[in-house]
Amino acid sequence: MKRRWQEKRKAAGKSIHEPGPNIVMGANAQVALEKFARYFDVETRLVPISEERKYCLDPKKAMEYVDENTIGVYVILGSTYTGHYEPVKEMAAHLDEYEARTGHSVPIHVDGASGGFVAPFATPKLEWDFRIPRVVSINTSGHKFGLSYVGVGWVVWRSKEFLPKDLIFELHYLGSVEYSFSLNFSRPAHPIIAQYFNFIHLGFEGYRQVALADLKNARLLSRALENSGLFTVLSDIHRPAKGLLSSAKQTVGFDEENVENYVPGLPVVSFRFSDEFRQKNPDVEQRWVQTLLRAKGWIVPNYELAPDMQDVQILRVVVRESTSAVMIDRLVSDILEVTEGLAKADSPMHALNNLQSRSTVEGHHGKLDEGSGSKSSGTYAKQC
């Protein structure tokens, strides 16, 4: 996108340095998106998130950050924080109107790192891909819901015109003509072989069954947490889609197994203490749940939402193909046990409060000294 923007600017006799290119994304963007902007000298324009817009990119607000130097807009198919899909079609509509009004065409890149292997199989009717003309490129990670090893990722362009030829290298010394478009050089083949095996072995229907099972278990976890009264669930995959009533009891013929009846999203469950629990237990810190669950063998991170909502902390569970209904039952039991234990004044779990002032070698291991990293630019990327 940057190279195509440069070519257009040069053709129009305009500078490519002043004021320089920018890219627009929600403040909830994954760190890889911010890395691109920093490494390739592109100004990052972060759109504030809000509860009303499901902690994701607000297309209408995003247009306040778009101008003739915007090389593109990142739209995320599966927010790292809550698993929500950002509205690709809505964003495209705003950019269509902008082009009609100004003559400036701003493309969309869909970051489908996780959703790229969920949405096409679980909700194929959802329009987020090349069915939308303004989407020019899509990426996804094979090592997430693609079920491959770490190290394989994919990027697909709408057509050859969106990948400038001068970015492609032609190699002749490997016994045949090879074409390369990559930032790394020698790399292992096993992740790609594993990905290819899954493509052949599972096929469309296999990936669909995996995605549907993941979402079903994620809905099970979401409902269990909400019904406990101890937590508020921020993710929405267990809620009926717009236009459907909120309860199967209120809806004649509601099919609880049909994924199309629910808000689309990743099989991710993000939750926090309910307001009622906080009022009754003001001294209990949510981050203690993470620590206690780790002692039981669960890795459930607790972290702040993106800027503008950084006062809200959430716990997050990613449901994958290895997660069964039995595991969900055990996880729920452990979450409720540690949470209820923290609420009891005579519980040993309150000893956590006394541990906060202690520092351990384990707690410091692998961390940089405070201030060693660059200043946070707004996304959730923070110093290790």
PLM features: what roles do these ranges have?
Residues 9-12, 92, 202-384:
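Non-catalytic terminal extensions of PLP-dependent enzymes
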Residues 30, 85-88, 192, 218, ...:
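Generic preference for well-ordered alpha-helical elements
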Residues 66, 114-121, 149-154, 177-184, ...:
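Noncatalytic linker/hinge segments flanking ATPase motor cores
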Residues 120-267, 271-278:
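Active-site C-terminal subdomain of aminotransferase-like
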Residues 18, 43, 72, 136, ...:
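Generic alpha-helix detector with strongest preference for long hydrophobic helices that associate
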Residues 1-169, 173-177, 181, 190:
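Conserved PLP-enzyme active-site core in the AAT-like
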Residues 23, 44, 108, 138-140, ...:
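Generic structural hydrophobic/aromatic packing signal, biased to beta-strands
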Residues 25-29, 54-57, 79, 83, ...:
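Catalytic cores of large soluble enzymes that bind and process phosphate-bearing ligands
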